[in-house]
């Protein structure tokens, strides 16, 4: 439906648009501010803007249409194409954003409700338990005994298995002092696992004449299997460091070679005797000051060492580390003072 709307100014006009030639969609009103000028002019979300102040908006870019609307004088004249309001029973094909939003919210609500009902049906105890009268439903208890444990749901699938024997189809609940199990066949009575009695044991279940229930002996294979499963799940875990230490100690007790241990776990007694009794390296002795050289040593000849500070000329005290030394008798001199003590250069011997 084509119509013309005059919005009284000045700007801002109180509505937002979307679309344009760059979006490949027509320019359309997406939001109208409450108690705004566009609301007073009956501008609605979903209206397609055909012309702005008489100028066609079909080829306008989005920014161009925004600029023309903002800079428009008062009144702002918009030629619109408004779709007819859909009836309550038919909303397909309608382009109104309000109707589309309502329809989307309704679909989301329906989807959420269906999922919540599905979760509740899976999580409710009634959905997991067999219906009354079904061949897998346990018989009702008229008066439960005091101290008996409720039937565990973790073994209901075992109780409902048709391929297992009647004595093996049970659900077990392990409360100390009273252990209870239920047969999964219709018409059978409950199976009670009782502690061992001093009397003779029997491998077959006996019938209790008073309560009409079956008494299962602890020597049965089903009871042993359930006990092994419980013990296997409750087995303590051992750390890898403790396991390595235990293996090393067992190897030493057997007289074998101990296994490799990390440095933080290795005992001091496992070190080799040669390493434990090794003496520290021998320190060189300075031939000038006759003290031990702890750090850096200057090697003059085989077996003759000096401190870097003692490696000096015997005449002027100049350090000979970067210059070399000259022997004159049994003393070290620099080149200058060594030449003064020898007239002939052939008598000099230089050693760097």
UniProtKB/Swiss-Prot annotation:
<feature type="modified residue" description="Phosphoserine">
    <location>
        <position position="127"/>
    </location>
</feature>
<dbReference type="GO" id="GO:0007507">
    <property type="term" value="P:heart development"/>
</dbReference>
<protein>
    <recommendedName>
        <fullName>PDZ and LIM domain protein 2</fullName>
    </recommendedName>
</protein>
<feature type="domain" description="LIM zinc-binding">
    <location>
        <begin position="284"/>
        <end position="344"/>
    </location>
</feature>
<feature type="region of interest" description="Disordered">
    <location>
        <begin position="170"/>
        <end position="214"/>
    </location>
</feature>
<feature type="compositionally biased region" description="Polar residues">
    <location>
        <begin position="81"/>
        <end position="95"/>
    </location>
</feature>
<keyword id="KW-0963">Cytoplasm</keyword>
<feature type="modified residue" description="Phosphoserine">
    <location>
        <position position="266"/>
    </location>
</feature>
<dbReference type="InterPro" id="IPR001478">
    <property type="entry name" value="PDZ"/>
</dbReference>
<dbReference type="GO" id="GO:0061061">
    <property type="term" value="P:muscle structure development"/>
</dbReference>
<keyword id="KW-0440">LIM domain</keyword>
<feature type="region of interest" description="Disordered">
    <location>
        <begin position="253"/>
        <end position="275"/>
    </location>
</feature>
<dbReference type="GO" id="GO:0030018">
    <property type="term" value="C:Z disc"/>
</dbReference>
<dbReference type="GO" id="GO:0003779">
    <property type="term" value="F:actin binding"/>
</dbReference>
<dbReference type="Pfam" id="PF00412">
    <property type="entry name" value="LIM"/>
</dbReference>
<dbReference type="InterPro" id="IPR050604">
    <property type="entry name" value="PDZ-LIM_domain"/>
</dbReference>
<dbReference type="GO" id="GO:0005912">
    <property type="term" value="C:adherens junction"/>
</dbReference>
<dbReference type="GO" id="GO:0031941">
    <property type="term" value="C:filamentous actin"/>
</dbReference>
<dbReference type="GO" id="GO:0030036">
    <property type="term" value="P:actin cytoskeleton organization"/>
</dbReference>
<feature type="modified residue" description="Phosphoserine">
    <location>
        <position position="124"/>
    </location>
</feature>
<feature type="modified residue" description="Phosphoserine">
    <location>
        <position position="134"/>
    </location>
</feature>
<feature type="modified residue" description="Phosphoserine">
    <location>
        <position position="203"/>
    </location>
</feature>
<feature type="compositionally biased region" description="Low complexity">
    <location>
        <begin position="117"/>
        <end position="135"/>
    </location>
</feature>
<keyword id="KW-0862">Zinc</keyword>
<dbReference type="GO" id="GO:0051371">
    <property type="term" value="F:muscle alpha-actinin binding"/>
</dbReference>
<feature type="modified residue" description="Phosphoserine">
    <location>
        <position position="143"/>
    </location>
</feature>
<feature type="modified residue" description="Phosphoserine">
    <location>
        <position position="129"/>
    </location>
</feature>
<feature type="region of interest" description="Disordered">
    <location>
        <begin position="108"/>
        <end position="141"/>
    </location>
</feature>
<dbReference type="GO" id="GO:0046872">
    <property type="term" value="F:metal ion binding"/>
</dbReference>
<comment type="subunit">
    <text>Interacts with alpha-actinins ACTN1 and ACTN4, FLNA and MYH9. Interacts (via LIM zinc-binding domain) with MKRN2.</text>
</comment>
<feature type="modified residue" description="Phosphoserine">
    <location>
        <position position="137"/>
    </location>
</feature>
<dbReference type="InterPro" id="IPR001781">
    <property type="entry name" value="Znf_LIM"/>
</dbReference>
<comment type="function">
    <text>Probable adapter protein located at the actin cytoskeleton that promotes cell attachment. Necessary for the migratory capacity of epithelial cells. Overexpression enhances cell adhesion to collagen and fibronectin and suppresses anchorage independent growth. May contribute to tumor cell migratory capacity.</text>
</comment>
<feature type="modified residue" description="Phosphoserine">
    <location>
        <position position="161"/>
    </location>
</feature>
<dbReference type="Pfam" id="PF00595">
    <property type="entry name" value="PDZ"/>
</dbReference>
<keyword id="KW-0479">Metal-binding</keyword>
<dbReference type="GO" id="GO:0001725">
    <property type="term" value="C:stress fiber"/>
</dbReference>
<keyword id="KW-0597">Phosphoprotein</keyword>
<feature type="modified residue" description="Phosphothreonine">
    <location>
        <position position="126"/>
    </location>
</feature>
<dbReference type="Pfam" id="PF15936">
    <property type="entry name" value="DUF4749"/>
</dbReference>
<feature type="domain" description="PDZ">
    <location>
        <begin position="1"/>
        <end position="84"/>
    </location>
</feature>
<feature type="modified residue" description="Phosphoserine">
    <location>
        <position position="197"/>
    </location>
</feature>
